């Protein structure tokens, strides 16, 4: 039987000093011996997805205490990728994932906590906490802040639901007036919560649900809705139940590595592919798998992408569909139900709320149950009022969206496509693979051939697009933006948004060893591995080289003879210290912290985790 970790610091004569300090935090004599459960909060006033989290840790804590535990809350950092984007701030985004994972590990192990509740929400925070939970392997439950409501606007005589990306595209389009742009900007992000489309934050929160590490509704219930309070309260109660099952009954099935097993990772990736989630999820799931010592690689993702259909499309893949619509259709449990109906989910996987995923689906899939409370839960609707306050409204739809033919979630027979929403491409340009979000690619450009336009920074590519030097048929290639080369693997939302605003979204492609925001759509191929800075072939592409992309056959090639590529490689190596670096020095301040990250990071094909 495992011993409570906390007793290292709460029991024994030699821990008198530690107990004195525990008492100074408010612990009483009767508290020593109770499980100490850490609450990792990520509240910050910098990020709309986290601005409402300040008091939610104590909401969880109250339930932990009422259930017989001791709750101790701490905070970690959170970066807003949207605010950090378009300047050197984005260099810090991906590296912050490792800082978050480390900070959670440090706090848990330094204070010998018995269990963990992770209050996350946005892009790197959920992945960082997920990595930490798999390192630590103590009972853990995730509960996120939830998605924001979509913006509602009557714009140019059209009634639209909009988000951050719509504001960016509107601003870049020269035919829109200043007032029209300002109107869109004011409407795009009306409430607290993670951006309303299937961007990275919402994708990852949906995937913790698919992994079995969070409660039903975690990925889709709006941040503003009163029902989300139930998730926080239940997380507090349920973590104590998991603690007792592990420490008092020796039940290892409640541990993160038992729940997030290989079959759970396959379930999560299957969900991701079926809903056209952010390509960043590939990066983060690969990283989490490494932390949990799960054999889950790009090979498995490639295999799954060939057999999983697209059952759900959400902004930015389609207009006017947001997370609130997914929730009305049954959320992630509804999507899991449709995938299970055609044998694509392993329902023997464990969860934090039911013994198996099969049991969970019987209760929470709206197509399988007539339980009134479940149906009421998924009828939670947006309030339509601008607010930064959690649980501030309780509006409900009159009915659920149970249409599996033309509704938000479809069955396999009526899928958007029988091929998955994410694809792994291989070829002489990406020996170790690269990723494309096929759910966001127009059918007319699933195969594409064009000349490479070479840029060695995101900034130079943006300038070229805005100055109209990119033409229909071009392939914008941005290199030296990978984990090591950036460093930090910047997101390329601005180049893709500007291509879209220039009317080039369906007639151009973009290839990079950097990554893309979950808000990206179009023929945008990222995570090219190996990256330019580690000797990848992307560094050898020259202006005008023809590149051929074939998504149906999962290939990406530059049409250059092998002998010529070898000649270019020898020529590059002859540069010595200047090899595998941008031709011209970039105006970019790389701090010691970023240099340390670059020195230890691995390629995107390995999740950009550190190699130590």
Curated annotation (Swiss-Prot):
GO biological process, one term: L-valine biosynthetic process
Main EC class the enzyme belongs to: lyase
Matching PANTHER family: D-XYLONATE DEHYDRATASE, D-XYLONATE DEHYDRATASE YAGF-RELATED
Gene3D superfamilies, alphabetized: IlvD/EDD C-terminal domain-like
GO MF annotation: an example: 2 iron, 2 sulfur cluster binding
Binding site for [2Fe-2S] cluster: 122, 195
Modified sites of kind N6-carboxylysine: 124
Domain of life according to the entry: Bacteria
UniProt pathway: Amino-acid biosynthesis; L-isoleucine biosynthesis; L-isoleucine from 2-oxobutanoate: step 3/4; Amino-acid biosynthesis; L-valine biosynthesis; L-valine from pyruvate: step 3/4
Protein species of origin: Bartonella henselae (strain ATCC 49882 / DSM 28221 / CCUG 30454 / Houston 1) (Rochalimaea henselae)
Enzyme Commission number(s) from the entry: 4.2.1.9
Cofactor(s) essential for the protein: [2Fe-2S] cluster; Mg(2+)
Protein name: Dihydroxy-acid dehydratase
Family: Belongs to the IlvD/Edd family.
Upper taxonomic lineage: Bacteria, Pseudomonadati, Pseudomonadota, Alphaproteobacteria, Hyphomicrobiales
Keywords noted in UniProt: 2Fe-2S, Amino-acid biosynthesis, Branched-chain amino acid biosynthesis, Iron, Iron-sulfur, Lyase, Magnesium, Metal-binding
Cofactor: how bound: Binds 1 [2Fe-2S] cluster per subunit. This cluster acts as a Lewis acid cofactor.
Name of the coding gene: ilvD
One Pfam entry name: ILVD_EDD_N
GO (cellular component) term, any one: cytosol
Biological role stated in the UniProt entry: Functions in the biosynthesis of branched-chain amino acids. Catalyzes the dehydration of (2R,3R)-2,3-dihydroxy-3-methylpentanoate (2,3-dihydroxy-3-methylvalerate) into 2-oxo-3-methylpentanoate (2-oxo-3-methylvalerate) and of (2R)-2,3-dihydroxy-3-methylbutanoate (2,3-dihydroxyisovalerate) into 2-oxo-3-methylbutanoate (2-oxoisovalerate), the penultimate precursor to L-isoleucine and L-valine, respectively.
Residues of the active site: 517
Binding site residues for Mg(2+): 81, 123-124, 491
């Amino acid at each position: 039987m495992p011993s409570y970790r906390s007793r290292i610091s709460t029991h024994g004569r030699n821990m008198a000093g530690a107990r004195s300090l525990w008492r100074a935090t408010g612990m009483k004599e009767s508290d020593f011996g109770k499980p100490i459960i850490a609450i990792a909060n990520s509240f910050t006033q910098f990020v709309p997805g986290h601005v409402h989290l300040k008091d939610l840790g104590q909401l969880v804590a109250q339930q932990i205490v009422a259930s017989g535990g001791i709750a101790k809350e701490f905070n970690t950092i959170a970066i807003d990728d949207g605010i950090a984007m378009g300047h050197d701030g984005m260099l810090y985004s991906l590296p912050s994932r490792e800082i978050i994972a480390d900070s959670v590990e440090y706090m848990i192990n330094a204070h010998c906590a018995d269990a963990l509740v992770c209050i996350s929400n946005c892009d790197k925070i959920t992945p960082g906490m997920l990595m930490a939970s798999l390192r630590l392997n103590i009972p853990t439950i995730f509960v996120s802040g939830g998605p924001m409501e979509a913006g509602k606007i009557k714009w140019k005589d059209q009634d639209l639901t909009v988000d951050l990306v719509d504001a960016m595209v509107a601003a870049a389009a020269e035919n829109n007036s200043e007032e029209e742009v300002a109107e869109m900007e004011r409407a795009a992000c009306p409430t607290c919560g993670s951006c309303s489309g299937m961007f990275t934050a919402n994708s990852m929160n949906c995937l913790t649900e698919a992994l079995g590490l969070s409660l039903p509704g975690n990925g889709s219930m709006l941040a503003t809705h009163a029902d989300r309070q139930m998730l926080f309260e239940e997380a507090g109660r349920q973590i104590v139940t998991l603690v007792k099952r592990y420490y008092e009954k020796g039940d290892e099935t409640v541990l993160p590595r038992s729940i997030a097993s290989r079959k759970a990772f396959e379930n999560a990736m299957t969900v991701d592919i079926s809903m056209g989630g952010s390509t960043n999820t590939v990066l983060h799931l690969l990283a989490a798998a490494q932390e949990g010592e799960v054999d889950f690689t790009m090979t498995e993702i490639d295999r799954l992408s060939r057999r999983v259909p697209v059952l759900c499309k959400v902004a930015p893949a389609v207009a006017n569909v947001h997370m609130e619509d997914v929730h009305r259709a049954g959320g992630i449990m509804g999507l899991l139900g449709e995938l299970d109906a055609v044998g694509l989910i392993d329902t023997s996987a464990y969860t934090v709320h039911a013994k198996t995923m099969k049991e969970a689906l019987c209760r929470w899939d709206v197509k399988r149950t007539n339980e009134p409370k479940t149906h009421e839960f998924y009828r939670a609707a947006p309030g339509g009022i601008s607010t930064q306050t959690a649980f501030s409204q309780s509006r409900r739809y009159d009915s659920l969206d149970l249409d599996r033919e033309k509704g938000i979630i479809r069955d396999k027979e009526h899928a958007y496509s029988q091929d998955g929403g994410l694809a792994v491409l291989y070829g002489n340009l990406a020996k170790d693979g690269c990723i494309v979000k096929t759910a966001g690619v127009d059918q007319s450009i699933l195969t594409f051939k064009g000349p490479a336009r070479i840029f060695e920074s995101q900034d130079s590519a943006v300038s070229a697009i805005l100055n109209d030097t990119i033409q229909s048929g071009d392939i914008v290639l941005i290199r030296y933006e990978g984990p090591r080369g950036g460093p930090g693997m910047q997101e390329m939302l601005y180049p893709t948004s500007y291509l879209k605003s220039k009317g080039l979204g369906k007639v151009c492609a973009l290839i990079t060893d950097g990554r893309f925001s979950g808000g990206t759509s179009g023929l945008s191929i990222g995570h090219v591995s190996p990256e330019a800075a580690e000797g990848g072939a992307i560094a050898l592409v020259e202006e005008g080289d023809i590149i051929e992309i074939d998504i149906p056959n999962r290939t990406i090639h530059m049409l250059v003879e092998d002998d010529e590529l070898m000649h270019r490689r020898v020529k590059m190596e002859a540069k010595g210290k200047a090899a595998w670096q941008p031709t011209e020095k970039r105006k970019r301040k790389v701090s010691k912290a970023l240099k340390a990250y670059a020195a230890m990071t691995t390629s995107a094909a390995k999740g950009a985790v550190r190699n130590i």
